[in-house]
Amino acid sequence: DKEIVLAGNDERGTFYALQTLSRLLKDNQLPAVEIKDYPSIRFRGVVEGFYGTPWSHAARLRQLKFYGENKMNTYIYGPKDDPYHSSPNWRLPYPEKEAEQLQELVKVAKENEVDFVWAIHPGQDIKWNQEDRDNLLAKFEKMYDLGVRSFAVFFDDISGEGTNPVKQAELLNYIDENFVKVKKDVTPLVMCPTEYNKSWSDPKGGYLTTLGDKLNPSIQIMWTGDRVISDITQEGIQWINERIKRPAYIWWNFPVSDYVRDHLLLGPVYGNDTRIA
């Protein structure tokens, strides 16, 4: 007798096994095979973090289905032109329609074994005081009520007092200790630093070293490589990891077209070091 056995390390692994099975089935026939499949990279997915017109709700729903089918486990919501993600309205709750759409995205992400990470971008006008700490936690509570269980804070592409690494670390640790760890079912916090690539960094690593020293160890720190748009190399990973004292959370800017809007960038992938996984 022949049988089909799907086994995964957890519910998500079994879901991925089902995706493999669906691709093997052709004309109601199935080859006699044994497939052992596992990821070499922990976080696999997409950041919607570009400038310009954000994706439509329908496009995001299609994307989440695509991620599940292709065993991608992370979608980070952070479109720069969403005013409730960034300035001027990051302190305010989403209007009813947008809140309902986000709630649906969280639901569909879960159905496709994708972690929906909601990001906030407060750095351009944040005040380093208790009032804005409370504002940020209140916004996170609103998103938690919509079903979000993964969160990120972006300090990229800002200027002024918001770039202070000591203040950033104090705020992030406060969120970590008063929200993330309190909730029990929220995944580790992710942050995008102001100096998110090597070419923009202090050669001595002052900003990055401060984050590495002061941020709670569980907080993930994003990194785009030697430049904004860059190959990811083993040497580059070693450089950043030494400074932030944890494995970098790679935000690979490919394909990024918000600076070239008259055509699509669809070239092949090359240049990334296969040893970085």
Whereabouts are the PLM-identified features?
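Acidic-enriched, low-complexity/disordered segments with a strong bias for Aspartate over Glutamate
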Residues: D1, D10, D27, D37, ...
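Feature activates predominantly on carbohydrate-active enzymes
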Residues: K2-D132, L136-K139, D145-R149
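Catalytic-core regions of glycoside hydrolase
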Residues: F50, K139, I158-A277
